[in-house]
């Protein structure tokens, strides 16, 4: 890495994420679809969105196979499997609709099945959640089985890694130390917005669900923080927007967080008690080999460093006070985020 005289940190509020990782809304909801939600925030917004998307048209479990052909299709009648796809490269295997549908499987690449990203055991397998396409995806059967009913989260040291880089292992996120499943960075936002859809479509119905990540009708704090982070760092893609439109054609409702991803913060920023521009004071400086992070008396947490595409480049535990973290990257602008029990702090920096 060449020496540069003007390496410096750019202090910024959390609201800068929106501009820094700008989300372009490709999906086009019908005119007036969200009129009753405009101008609201917090729980009133969530309730208004619930009333808009409630009562969707349900399909049968068997009909999911054909539905996937319009919601999750690549060119050539191929399955868009987020547990095996590699957007920036060549996937290890690609399934054909119908031909490669599970049956049985013994390893990755055998067949695809129906993945409840929000596991069915978490809502007792009840309808209409059981066939709600906004959280159901076609995925490799073997990887689906490995994921099992584990929550989504950020993995520290992986116990198992799929061929596209999805991981299973102990959770790195503050507040939980069990096993989690981590999809690749390119699809984290897709799954996060699926979860926020579930928290909105089934608002008022979740209090009796045995979901380990749901408490008092909402995501528990550690999982909520992960989902908010993933929503921010993997912006809505044309693929996700096209899927929103395809599901709308079948179910006659939409995922509002694909159409308007900023509504995640408008609702759950307040629930988390973390306004967009708040968090423990953080000062970050870089040198030739790493990052010096000063956080005063803030609690220990986890440092994440992202590039402008939202890819995670570094995940590291961080202590209170002053920490030094080894880091190296090409010249450019990066985003540092610290999540701790105190909240989250975000700062852009030039490397």
Q: What spans do the regions from the language model cover?
A:
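Bacterial Sec-dependent N-terminal signal peptides
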Residues: 1-31
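N-terminal module-boundary/linker segments of secreted carbohydrate-active enzymes
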Residues: 27-89
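Low-complexity, Pro/Thr/Ser/Gly/Ala-rich linker/spacer regions in secreted
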Residues: 28-30, 268-280
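Short clusters of hydrophobic/aromatic residues that line enzyme substrate/ligand-binding pockets
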Residues: 82, 257, 274, 301
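Short, flexible beta-strand-to-coil junctions
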Residues: 83-89, 199-201, 338-340
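Short, His- and charge-rich active-site/binding loops that engage polyanionic ligands
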Residues: 86-111
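Domain-level detector of nuclease and nuclease-like folds
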Residues: 102-113, 117-270
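C-terminal outer-membrane/trafficking sorting elements
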Residues: 277-351
């Amino acid at each position: 890495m060449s020496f540069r005289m003007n390496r410096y940190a750019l202090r910024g509020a959390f609201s800068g994420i929106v501009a820094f990782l700008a989300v372009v809304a490709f999906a086009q909801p019908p005119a007036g679809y969200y009129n009753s939600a405009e101008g609201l925030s917090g729980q009133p917004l969530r309730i208004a969105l619930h009333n808009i998307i409630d009562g969707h048209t349900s399909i049968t479990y068997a009909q999911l196979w054909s539905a996937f052909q319009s919601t999750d299709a690549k060119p050539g009648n191929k399955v868009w499997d987020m547990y095996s796809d590699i957007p920036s490269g060549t996937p290890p295997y690609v399934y054909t609709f119908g031909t490669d549908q599970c049956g049985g499987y013994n390893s990755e690449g055998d067949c695809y099945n129906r993945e409840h990203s929000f596991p069915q055991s978490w809502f007792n397998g009840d309808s209409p959640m059981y066939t709600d396409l906004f959280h159901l995806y076609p995925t490799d059967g073997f990887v689906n089985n490995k994921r099992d009913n584990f929550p989504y989260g950020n993995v520290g040291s992986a116990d198992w890694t799929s061929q596209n880089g999805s991981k299973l292992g102990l959770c790195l996120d503050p507040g939980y130390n069990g096993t989690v499943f981590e999809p690749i960075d390119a699809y984290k936002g897709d799954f996060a917005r699926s979860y926020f859809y579930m928290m909105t479509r089934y608002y008022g119905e979740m209090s009796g669900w045995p979901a380990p990540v749901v408490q008092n009708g909402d995501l528990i704090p550690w999982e909520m923080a992960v989902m908010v982070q993933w929503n921010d760092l993997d912006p809505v893609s044309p693929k996700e927007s096209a899927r929103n439109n395809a599901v709308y054609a079948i179910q006659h409702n939409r995922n509002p967080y694909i159409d308007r991803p900023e509504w995640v913060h408008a609702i759950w920023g307040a629930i988390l008690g973390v306004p967009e521009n708040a968090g423990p004071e953080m000062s970050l400086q870089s040198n030739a080999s790493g990052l010096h992070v000063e956080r005063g008396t803030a609690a220990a947490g986890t440092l994440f460093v992202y590039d402008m595409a939202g890819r995670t480049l570094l995940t590291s535990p961080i202590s209170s006070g002053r920490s030094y973290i080894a880091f190296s990257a090409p010249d450019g602008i990066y985003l540092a985020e610290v999540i701790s029990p105190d909240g989250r702090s975000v700062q852009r920096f030039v490397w």
